[in-house]
Protein backbone atom coordinates (compact mmCIF):
# COMPACT_ATOMS: atom_id res chain seq x y z
CA UNK A 1 0.00 0.00 0.00
CA UNK A 2 2.80 2.37 0.92
CA UNK A 3 4.46 1.69 -2.45
CA UNK A 4 1.25 2.47 -4.32
CA UNK A 5 0.78 5.76 -2.42
CA UNK A 6 4.36 6.80 -3.14
CA UNK A 7 3.84 6.02 -6.84
CA UNK A 8 0.69 8.11 -7.05
CA UNK A 9 2.27 10.97 -5.13
CA UNK A 10 5.35 11.02 -7.36
CA UNK A 11 3.41 10.93 -10.66
CA UNK A 12 0.87 13.52 -9.50
CA UNK A 13 3.68 15.93 -8.61
CA UNK A 14 5.27 15.36 -12.00
CA UNK A 15 2.02 16.15 -13.80
CA UNK A 16 1.46 19.24 -11.66
CA UNK A 17 4.99 20.44 -12.38
CA UNK A 18 4.50 20.00 -16.13
CA UNK A 19 1.26 22.02 -16.02
CA UNK A 20 2.95 24.84 -14.09
CA UNK A 21 5.87 24.93 -16.53
CA UNK A 22 3.48 25.15 -19.51
CA UNK A 23 1.53 28.04 -17.97
CA UNK A 24 4.75 29.84 -17.06
CA UNK A 25 6.19 29.53 -20.57
CA UNK A 26 2.93 30.73 -22.17
CA UNK A 27 2.75 33.84 -19.97
CA UNK A 28 6.40 34.70 -20.41
CA UNK A 29 6.20 34.37 -24.20
CA UNK A 30 3.06 36.45 -24.71
CA UNK A 31 4.60 39.89 -24.12
CA UNK A 32 7.51 39.08 -26.42
CA UNK A 33 5.19 37.91 -29.18
CA UNK A 34 3.08 41.06 -28.83
CA UNK A 35 6.18 43.21 -28.98
CA UNK A 36 7.31 41.49 -32.16
CA UNK A 37 3.98 41.66 -33.99
CA UNK A 38 2.68 45.10 -32.91
CA UNK A 39 4.21 48.03 -34.82
CA UNK A 40 3.24 51.69 -35.29
CA UNK A 41 3.45 53.10 -38.80
CA UNK A 42 5.00 56.61 -38.93
CA UNK A 43 2.69 59.40 -40.14
CA UNK A 44 4.24 61.44 -42.99
CA UNK A 45 3.50 65.22 -43.08
CA UNK A 46 1.87 65.10 -46.54
CA UNK A 47 -0.26 62.42 -48.14
CA UNK A 48 -2.29 61.50 -51.21
CA UNK A 49 -6.01 61.99 -50.72
CA UNK A 50 -8.40 59.08 -51.17
CA UNK A 51 -9.38 60.49 -54.59
CA UNK A 52 -5.90 59.53 -55.83
CA UNK A 53 -5.16 63.07 -57.07
CA UNK A 54 -5.03 65.74 -54.34
CA UNK A 55 -1.89 66.24 -52.25
CA UNK A 56 -2.81 67.19 -48.68
CA UNK A 57 -0.91 68.10 -45.51
CA UNK A 58 -1.46 67.19 -41.90
CA UNK A 59 -1.59 70.02 -39.35
CA UNK A 60 1.97 69.32 -38.22
CA UNK A 61 3.48 69.81 -41.70
CA UNK A 62 5.88 72.77 -41.68
CA UNK A 63 5.29 75.66 -44.08
CA UNK A 64 8.34 76.10 -46.31
CA UNK A 65 9.48 72.52 -45.97
CA UNK A 66 9.78 70.16 -48.91
CA UNK A 67 8.46 66.64 -48.58
CA UNK A 68 8.79 63.85 -51.12
CA UNK A 69 5.79 61.76 -52.06
CA UNK A 70 5.87 59.09 -54.76
CA UNK A 71 9.16 60.45 -56.05
CA UNK A 72 8.00 64.08 -56.32
CA UNK A 73 9.00 66.90 -53.96
CA UNK A 74 6.22 69.22 -52.79
CA UNK A 75 6.69 72.49 -50.91
CA UNK A 76 4.16 73.25 -48.18
CA UNK A 77 2.85 76.82 -48.56
CA UNK A 78 0.39 79.23 -46.97
CA UNK A 79 -0.97 82.66 -47.90
CA UNK A 80 2.31 84.38 -47.07
CA UNK A 81 4.56 82.08 -49.11
CA UNK A 82 2.63 80.87 -52.15
CA UNK A 83 3.24 83.99 -54.28
CA UNK A 84 7.01 83.65 -54.00
CA UNK A 85 6.87 80.01 -55.07
CA UNK A 86 4.74 80.90 -58.11
CA UNK A 87 7.17 83.70 -58.99
CA UNK A 88 9.94 81.08 -58.98
CA UNK A 89 7.87 78.89 -61.31
CA UNK A 90 7.36 76.22 -58.66
CA UNK A 91 3.86 74.75 -58.78
CA UNK A 92 4.70 71.48 -57.02
CA UNK A 93 3.00 72.80 -53.94
CA UNK A 94 0.95 71.43 -51.08
CA UNK A 95 -1.69 74.16 -50.66
CA UNK A 96 -3.71 72.81 -47.74
CA UNK A 97 -2.97 75.93 -45.63
CA UNK A 98 -3.84 78.45 -48.38
CA UNK A 99 -7.02 80.55 -48.07
CA UNK A 100 -6.41 83.21 -50.73
CA UNK A 101 -5.56 82.42 -54.36
CA UNK A 102 -6.46 85.81 -55.82
CA UNK A 103 -4.51 86.83 -58.95
CA UNK A 104 -2.00 83.98 -58.61
CA UNK A 105 -1.50 83.65 -62.37
CA UNK A 106 -2.82 87.04 -63.46
CA UNK A 107 -1.16 88.23 -66.69
CA UNK A 108 1.03 85.11 -66.82
CA UNK A 109 0.51 84.52 -70.52
CA UNK A 110 2.78 81.46 -70.73
CA UNK A 111 1.52 79.50 -67.73
CA UNK A 112 -0.02 76.13 -68.58
CA UNK A 113 1.11 73.66 -65.91
CA UNK A 114 -0.80 70.88 -64.19
CA UNK A 115 -2.15 72.05 -60.81
CA UNK A 116 -5.12 69.70 -60.52
CA UNK A 117 -3.47 68.10 -57.46
CA UNK A 118 -3.66 71.32 -55.43
CA UNK A 119 -5.68 71.14 -52.24
CA UNK A 120 -8.18 74.02 -52.45
CA UNK A 121 -10.47 72.86 -49.66
CA UNK A 122 -9.59 75.87 -47.46
CA UNK A 123 -9.57 78.51 -50.21
CA UNK A 124 -12.22 81.22 -49.87
CA UNK A 125 -11.28 83.52 -52.76
CA UNK A 126 -10.14 82.75 -56.30
CA UNK A 127 -10.74 86.27 -57.59
CA UNK A 128 -8.93 86.75 -60.93
CA UNK A 129 -6.69 83.72 -60.35
CA UNK A 130 -6.37 83.08 -64.11
CA UNK A 131 -7.07 86.59 -65.37
CA UNK A 132 -5.35 87.05 -68.72
CA UNK A 133 -3.54 83.71 -68.34
CA UNK A 134 -4.08 83.29 -72.05
CA UNK A 135 -2.30 79.92 -72.46
CA UNK A 136 -3.83 78.11 -69.51
CA UNK A 137 -5.99 75.13 -70.41
CA UNK A 138 -5.38 72.43 -67.80
CA UNK A 139 -7.83 70.14 -66.04
CA UNK A 140 -8.80 71.60 -62.65
CA UNK A 141 -12.12 69.80 -62.37
CA UNK A 142 -10.91 67.96 -59.28
CA UNK A 143 -10.59 71.14 -57.19
CA UNK A 144 -12.60 71.31 -53.97
CA UNK A 145 -14.29 74.72 -54.23
CA UNK A 146 -16.78 74.18 -51.42
CA UNK A 147 -15.33 77.04 -49.31
CA UNK A 148 -14.92 79.58 -52.12
CA UNK A 149 -17.11 82.68 -51.88
CA UNK A 150 -15.45 84.89 -54.53
CA UNK A 151 -14.97 83.72 -58.13
CA UNK A 152 -15.16 87.17 -59.73
CA UNK A 153 -12.93 87.51 -62.80
CA UNK A 154 -11.63 83.99 -62.33
CA UNK A 155 -11.22 83.27 -66.06
CA UNK A 156 -11.26 86.89 -67.22
CA UNK A 157 -9.67 86.88 -70.70
CA UNK A 158 -8.36 83.34 -70.15
CA UNK A 159 -8.87 82.83 -73.85
CA UNK A 160 -7.65 79.21 -74.10
CA UNK A 161 -9.45 77.69 -71.14
CA UNK A 162 -12.10 75.10 -71.97
CA UNK A 163 -12.00 72.37 -69.33
CA UNK A 164 -14.81 70.52 -67.56
CA UNK A 165 -15.55 72.24 -64.24
CA UNK A 166 -19.20 71.26 -64.13
CA UNK A 167 -18.83 69.28 -60.90
CA UNK A 168 -17.44 72.15 -58.87
CA UNK A 169 -19.18 72.82 -55.57
CA UNK A 170 -20.24 76.47 -55.86
CA UNK A 171 -22.69 76.43 -52.96
CA UNK A 172 -20.75 79.10 -51.02
CA UNK A 173 -20.08 81.50 -53.92
CA UNK A 174 -21.63 84.98 -53.73
CA UNK A 175 -19.68 86.84 -56.45
CA UNK A 176 -19.33 85.70 -60.09
CA UNK A 177 -18.88 89.13 -61.70
CA UNK A 178 -16.94 88.84 -64.97
CA UNK A 179 -16.06 85.23 -64.24
CA UNK A 180 -15.84 84.25 -67.93
CA UNK A 181 -15.39 87.75 -69.38
CA UNK A 182 -13.87 87.27 -72.86
CA UNK A 183 -13.06 83.63 -72.06
CA UNK A 184 -13.53 83.09 -75.76
CA UNK A 185 -12.98 79.30 -75.85
CA UNK A 186 -15.04 78.22 -72.86
CA UNK A 187 -18.13 76.16 -73.60
CA UNK A 188 -18.57 73.54 -70.88
CA UNK A 189 -21.75 72.38 -69.16
CA UNK A 190 -22.06 74.22 -65.82
CA UNK A 191 -25.84 74.00 -65.64
CA UNK A 192 -25.80 72.03 -62.39
CA UNK A 193 -23.87 74.65 -60.41
CA UNK A 194 -25.43 75.74 -57.12
CA UNK A 195 -25.82 79.50 -57.52
CA UNK A 196 -28.32 79.97 -54.70
CA UNK A 197 -26.05 82.36 -52.75
CA UNK A 198 -24.78 84.38 -55.71
CA UNK A 199 -25.73 88.06 -55.59
CA UNK A 200 -23.54 89.46 -58.39
CA UNK A 201 -23.24 88.22 -62.00
CA UNK A 202 -22.57 91.39 -63.98
CA UNK A 203 -20.61 90.77 -67.23
CA UNK A 204 -20.25 87.10 -66.29
CA UNK A 205 -20.18 85.92 -69.94
CA UNK A 206 -19.36 89.19 -71.66
CA UNK A 207 -17.86 88.32 -75.07
CA UNK A 208 -17.58 84.65 -74.13
CA UNK A 209 -18.03 83.94 -77.82
CA UNK A 210 -18.26 80.14 -77.69
CA UNK A 211 -20.52 79.73 -74.67
CA UNK A 212 -24.06 78.49 -75.32
CA UNK A 213 -24.82 76.07 -72.46
CA UNK A 214 -28.20 75.76 -70.74
CA UNK A 215 -28.35 77.79 -67.50
CA UNK A 216 -32.12 77.78 -67.10
CA UNK A 217 -31.89 75.52 -64.04
CA UNK A 218 -29.77 77.93 -62.02
CA UNK A 219 -31.13 79.17 -58.70
CA UNK A 220 -30.90 82.96 -58.99
CA UNK A 221 -33.46 84.05 -56.42
CA UNK A 222 -31.04 86.72 -55.12
CA UNK A 223 -30.87 88.42 -58.54
CA UNK A 224 -34.23 89.86 -59.59
CA UNK A 225 -33.36 90.82 -63.17
CA UNK A 226 -30.64 90.14 -65.73
CA UNK A 227 -27.39 91.75 -64.55
CA UNK A 228 -25.75 94.38 -66.74
CA UNK A 229 -23.76 92.84 -69.57
CA UNK A 230 -24.45 89.30 -68.34
CA UNK A 231 -24.03 87.74 -71.79
CA UNK A 232 -23.33 90.74 -74.03
CA UNK A 233 -21.55 89.77 -77.27
CA UNK A 234 -21.86 86.07 -76.46
CA UNK A 235 -23.80 83.35 -78.27
CA UNK A 236 -25.97 82.51 -75.25
CA UNK A 237 -29.63 82.61 -76.37
CA UNK A 238 -32.27 84.08 -74.08
CA UNK A 239 -34.30 80.89 -73.73
CA UNK A 240 -31.49 79.05 -71.87
CA UNK A 241 -30.49 81.94 -69.62
CA UNK A 242 -31.28 81.78 -65.89
CA UNK A 243 -34.86 82.66 -64.97
CA UNK A 244 -34.04 85.72 -62.88
CA UNK A 245 -35.57 85.98 -59.44
CA UNK A 246 -36.44 82.29 -59.30
CA UNK A 247 -35.02 79.09 -57.89
CA UNK A 248 -36.17 76.13 -60.04
Ranges and model annotations:
Residues 9-16:
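Positively charged n-region of N-terminal signal peptides that target proteins for export
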Residues 5-8, 36:
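Leucine-biased recognition of intrinsically disordered, low-complexity hydrophobic segments
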Residues 22-23, 240:
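Residue-level signal for mature regions of secreted extracellular proteins and peptides
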Residues 3-5, 100:
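Hydrophobic alpha-helical signal peptides and transmembrane signal-/tail-anchor segments
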Residues 18-20:
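Sec-dependent N-terminal signal peptides
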Residues 25-28:
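C-terminal motif of bacterial Sec signal peptides marking the signal peptidase cleavage site
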Residues 31-248:
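Negatively charged
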Amino acid sequence: IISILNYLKTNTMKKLLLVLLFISSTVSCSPDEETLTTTTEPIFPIYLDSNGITIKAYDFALVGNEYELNGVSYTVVDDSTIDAQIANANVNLCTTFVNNMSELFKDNSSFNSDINFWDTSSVTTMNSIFENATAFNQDIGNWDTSSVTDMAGMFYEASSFNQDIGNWNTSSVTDMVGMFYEASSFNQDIGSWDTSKVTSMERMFWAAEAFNQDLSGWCVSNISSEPAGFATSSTLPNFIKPVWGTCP
